[in-house]
Amino acid sequence: MSKDFLLEIGLEEMPAQYVTSSVLQLEKRVTDWLTENKIEFGEIKTYSTPRRLTVLVEGMAEEQANRVEEAKGPAKKIALDDEGNWSKAALGFAKSQKVDPADLTFRDIKGVEYIYIKKEVIGEKTSTLLPNLEKVVTSMTFPVSMHWGSNDLRYIRPIKWLIAMFGEEIIPFEITGVTTSNTSRGHRFLGKSATIKQPSDYPNALLEQFVVVNAEERKQAIVEQLRELESMENWQIKEDDDLLEEVTNLVEYPTVLSGNFEKEYLELPEEVLITTMKEHQRYFPVFSQAGELLPHFVTVRNGNHENLDTVARGNEKVLRARLSDADFFYQEDLKMTIDEAVAKLQNIVFHEKLGTLTEKMKRVQKVALMLADYLDWQEEDKQDIIRLTNIYKFDLVTNIVGEFPELQGLMGEKYALLQGEKPAIATAIREHYLPNSAEGELPQTDLGSLIAIADKLETLIGFFCVNIVPTGSADPFGLRRSAFGAMRIIQANGWDIPMLEVISRIVDMERAEGSAELPGADVKKEVQTFLKNRLRVILQGHHIRHDIIDAVIGGDPNVIPQLIDRAQILNEHAEAEWFRPTIEALSRVVKIAKKYEDGVEVDPALFENEYEQALFDKLEKLKFDYAGLTIIERLKAFADLRTTIDAYFDNTLVMSDNDELKNNRLALLFELASFIKEFAQMDEINVK
């Protein structure tokens, strides 16, 4: 037999961004608890609003199933005394397992006998176990939490009521003075208390009190009302998943309404208007069918259709004040020149150990010019770099960015264009912040890409130099994001930038300017390791085998696009017939070459057979051709060497008793191994 079970945690209004993750956490914790307690159950449904987290478990067994359990005790040699009677250890084990010593048996495990017991455990009634769910509720963790009253519990918001019902039975427990019952609370203003007769009544009982407890149903109701308004007004209301998710978790009974603002505010940059509406007010912007922003907005009310005009006027008043402030900030910004803004940057500290923004921009300029040299950029391009790096952070001191930090870069682009900067420089000011997420948009221009890489690498290495590095999940300065973004941009552009050399030069620059606390060699090594770990993430995103990732990162990690190409090509050909014998042959060369002693050069006059000469000739051709070969051509060249390598080993004793011959042969293998290891550490690849 089974019954449904309902658990509702009633709270003061939670932050919208944590509602979904919190109810999913509750679902997992309840699921784990049921599994651990061997209680069978059917489907688990979740419900959530800003004021409640709920799970409804269908078909929960009324009692645990009877089961047979086994337990292993002490070894036989200590379970019996000298006279063959049970020892204290054996008797203690029997007592702990609640069995008669007569039921103890022995079982052989890998040649050693141990006490074993097999006992039948009678399942407990579920209703006697469910009060322990109190610990499940109190053990939940949240990104933000608080405590209230005189209790010690920290929770996302104060608990105001609790429901725990197994069928019609109330499961008793208490948390912070709140006792479980079968009574929930309806909408804060429109509803009343709702008595739940049985768990399956829960959604409808709350709906009668103006609460839509199913988050997906609330979301769908909002979408349908938005589409209806679009059709009625001939508008476009662009769906924004993040905004839709947030407003869904801000309301319990959604009603969509629209409002207006003065047309003159349309003279503000569109991004300022949209950000004001979306980020500050949680409004949906409205567009014409041609995609032009209109002087209207759409919002979602937590309530019904009564007095919508009054609600709309209230929202219009709030938005009007916001837009008036934005217009004032914008007009004030237009009075300030870029050079005046740049001068203020020397008063803004980037980090106490890394100086001001002005000092950071100067360091980034050096890095950007260094990268331009590696990429053979022209003098005109370098002049653009100099101008760009002299100003590219200027918008951080503008009023609009002070009010709307998410518009940094974007407002810099707009202000730069208004003041006559080159479009390429203006665009790069915006693009240097990209990508702003793991899968975010990348810069589309060369100049924007270069400054983004320079800024991110300087930030990363600067913090490493002063011993501020990510630890565990803590990364307050976004250094993982900086590294990941820089490498994504380098890969996308296919730029053969020698990363190890660049890292070394940036570390030396930071140390020369006094912003370093650690020895240069230590920092260089730490940054290289950090970037290699980010590369692993990129390669995993390309679904590269883990052993191949280890192999290419263990090879030459210097040029990122080439490294990624090598990994992809090895991965693509891993199932080819020739792949395994080729990797085995190359790995053999690498392993034996480790015995090479420095200073010995290959002397063809010491060759004793044609197979040594053949391998030498192939190596000389590889040396001549290698730089001009593509990645796939290099792999094919190694594959072509396989039969020559096999013949060499079949007919040549590398570790000869004659030291001169041995060292000459090791020198030949060492030269070949150098090319192989640059491509990848082939012995890391699993071909078994």
UniProtKB/Swiss-Prot annotation:
Top-level taxon in the UniProt lineage: Bacteria
UniProt-annotated location(s): Cytoplasm
Keywords: Aminoacyl-tRNA synthetase, ATP-binding, Cytoplasm, Ligase, Nucleotide-binding, Protein biosynthesis
Record has Aminoacyl-tRNA synthetase as a keyword: yes
InterPro entries: Gly-tRNA-synth_bsu (IPR015944), Gly-tRNA-synth_heterodimer (IPR006194)
PROSITE patterns xrefs: AA_TRNA_LIGASE_II_GLYAB
Catalytic activity: tRNA(Gly) + glycine + ATP = glycyl-tRNA(Gly) + AMP + diphosphate
Record EC number: 6.1.1.14
Keyword set includes tRNA processing: no
Pfam families: tRNA_synt_2f
GO MF term set: ATP binding; glycine-tRNA ligase activity
One of the GO BP terms on file: glycyl-tRNA aminoacylation
Family of the protein in this entry: Belongs to the class-II aminoacyl-tRNA synthetase family.
PANTHER family: GLYCINE--TRNA LIGASE, CHLOROPLASTIC_MITOCHONDRIAL 2, GLYCYL-TRNA SYNTHETASE
Assembly and binders: Tetramer of two alpha and two beta subunits.
Protein name (record): Glycine--tRNA ligase beta subunit
Gene this chain is encoded by: glyS
